Regions:
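N-terminal transmembrane-helix/juxtamembrane module of multi-pass inner/ER membrane proteins
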Residues: 2-73, 113-120, 125
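Membrane-embedded catalytic cores of phosphoryl/pyrophosphoryl-handling enzymes
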Residues: 2-13, 133-226
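Juxtamembrane loop-transmembrane helix junctions in multi-pass integral membrane proteins
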Residues: 4, 47-57, 84-88, 164-171
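Hydrophobic, lipid-facing residues on alpha-helical transmembrane segments of integral membrane proteins
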Residues: 11-18, 66, 70, 98-107, ...
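Aromatic-anchored segments of alpha-helical transmembrane domains
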Residues: 19-24, 101-107, 178-188
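Structural signal for the C-terminal ends of transmembrane alpha-helices
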Residues: 25-27, 73-85, 163-168, 211-217
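Membrane-interface loops
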Residues: 88-165, 171
């Protein structure tokens, strides 16, 4: 069963990445979805929803939250070397820590976001900015950091729980997507990201969590970390 699930998980994510990217290359849906939150008639505040108090809380505390989760995982991993009651959770804690560090930390923010140069919606010409729209995956030549969504990766980091869970996987998957897409919504209201940025953030973090789980976690024996 695990072998088949491993195969289908990878195929489904790769197909979704290809199909959604093609849709955004061949249509103007990326632009149209972003335009829902753009109100040019409101002079001086063309992205008004971004000021909602709840959305501001989500924006301000997303990264402190995931840092706290990472620090907690690191603490459990370190404590497992001195306290027996933490030892059964050593591998799980290290796996969660690695997913956070390599997914949102390295791949999303340091590799893609910092170097892809895709303009944010707020900075493209259609929304009063200076840059031309660039479709997802295509590298831009601006200082903008639209591709991919960093705040969304905070939610997607909980793909780690999906992989670790032995039961109710679909529930954990739904909760992870719900959290990530809520974060994506907060960024779209400010003109910070396109839908394609949000989806690609998920594809990347999922692939990191997938590779760590099947390439390392599922292969090692608990005794190897003693």
């Amino acid at each position: 069963m695990t072998h088949y699930r491993r195969f289908y998980e990878l195929i489904i994510v790769l197909l979704l990445a290809i199909l959604t990217t093609l849709v955004f290359w061949l249509t103007d849906w990326d632009y149209r979805l972003a335009s829902i939150f753009y109100h040019p008639e409101k002079i001086g505040d063309v992205w008004p929803l971004q000021h909602h108090w709840f959305l501001k809380i989500l924006f301000d505390y997303a990264f402190p939250f995931i840092v706290a989760v990472g620090v907690s995982a690191l603490s459990i991993f370190l404590l497992s070397h001195v306290h027996d009651h933490s030892r059964p959770y050593r591998r799980q804690a290290l796996y969660v820590l690695l997913v956070i560090a390599l997914g949102p930390g390295l791949v999303v923010n340091l590799i893609f976001k910092d170097h892809w140069g895709r303009p944010r919606p707020v900075h493209i010409q259609e929304f009063g900015g200076e840059y031309q729209y660039i479709p997802p995956v295509k590298i831009g030549h601006t200082l903008d950091k639209s591709f991919v969504c960093g705040h969304c990766s905070v939610g997607y980091a909980f793909f780690a729980v999906y992989f670790l869970a032995k039961n109710h996987k679909l529930i954990y998957l739904a909760l992870t997507l719900g959290l990530a897409w809520t974060m994506g919504f907060t960024r779209m209201t400010a003109g910070g990201h396109f839908v394609s940025d949000i989806l690609w953030s998920g594809y990347l973090v999922f692939l990191v969590a997938y590779a760590l789980y099947y390439g390392w976690y599922a292969r090692i024996k608990p005794s190897s970390l003693e």
